[in-house]
Amino acid sequence: MTFELTTRAIKISLTGVAGAALVCGGLAQTAISSTPTSASDPIGGWSESWGAAMQRPTPGTEDNGPNWSMKGFADQSVRQVIRLSEGGDRVRIRLSNVYGTKPLKIAGAAVGTSAGGAKVWPGTIKTLKFHGAASTVVKPGAELASDPVALPTKPLQKLAVTLRFTEPTGPTTFHRFTTQEAYRASGDHLTEPVSAAFAKSTNSWYYLTGVDVAGGAGAQGTVVTFGDSLIDGVGSTGDERIADGLAERLAAQGRPTTVINAGIGGNRILGDTACYGDKAPTRFRRDVLDRPGVRSVIIHLGANDIAAAKIEDPCLPKGGTLPTARQLIEGHRALIRAAHARGIKAIGATILPLKGALFPIWSPEAEKVRDEVNHWIRTSGEYDAVLDVDRVMADRTDPDRPWLGYVFEDGLHPNDAGYQAIVRAVPLGAL
């Protein structure tokens, strides 16, 4: 989905992804590299308990709030709060420099139990090492895991990860929208549990792409939620995103399963820009297929491709055209084929209602495309199961609109009640 907000005020903008799809014979050609294999067990006993999809650095705007991705960091400490979906007795973090243009120098890293805000519970802070060293360098285009550290954790527990930078990083690899804040302090505050120096904050994650756990109940695989801002959680507060609610639902049923949010607000099937992530077929391998132990993926995509034809956005090419349902369906099929080649189940989420949004995205022609794609998702049998977001969100008297009780103030995205209703509709037996 394509609409961003800050937690300090309701500031919303239609965002999207630029770039033309590679088209041949009217169909988007979306080949995804995938070596046929079965879904692997978590590597070495490790399970990815939290993760984020990385993006190129892009300036913040009045609508989506400021971020530090363009300037980067120098002689600063950055503390980021995440919530695990599964616990264990050991923890490691993974850092990404996938969009970096120079080596990323990490002077230090630490992890501990979050005490709210930028605070960490005293006695829980553990310094991290990388191949036995306190500092490390992440090559451009690469990711790197820390050495494991002993830290008992539980499902749904929040951790604070602190990174120390002593040299200018330049523009950062990051995830733009979160419902958690990242905190910045000048100087070295790596292991301080409470510090007034963490006075600056933004709603983004920087370099941190994953947190893994080992030694717990033994996760029965990983579920990845993949797609646009509906997956990213725009319109929600706190930990009310689909991945969060699904983790809670699985934990309540005693099913140890990790759930990863690989959503990017504004993401599309047919085009990419720096603002809203690589197009879905391009990033599917990194954000879904290459994660350890993935057994199923929930996919919600297509709304931004439809909406981009009617909006004006500096990140989008002017004069966009409405895609055909066939183009979007072919994009979905490419993702399904790639998932199945790895033994991963694919659950298709129907596109949520677009009519009534505060942004000029709806038209009868756009509705026809949405209806055709949704009909295919529901009836083709190509997805292993269906999460019918459209019917969950629809107003019963006007199904092209969302029901007011489930919609955020932008008239499009779910509010917390809407996200909770979507989570209840997830077919757990298909995961």
Residue locations for each model-derived region?
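Catalytic His-Asp segment of secreted/periplasmic serine-dependent ester chemistry enzymes
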Residues: 351-431
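Active-site segments of SGNH/GDSL-like serine hydrolases
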Residues: 300-305, 335-370
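Solvent-exposed loop/turn segments at secondary-structure junctions
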Residues: 167-168, 229-233, 264-270, 303-307, ...
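Structured segments of extracytoplasmic/periplasmic soluble domains
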Residues: 112, 248-253, 262, 287, ...
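Short hydrophobic segments within beta-strands
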Residues: 226-227, 349
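Conserved SGNH/GDSL esterase-like catalytic core that processes O-acyl groups on lipids
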Residues: 50, 74-80, 103, 107-112, ...
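N-terminal secretory targeting modules
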Residues: 2-19, 25-226, 235-238
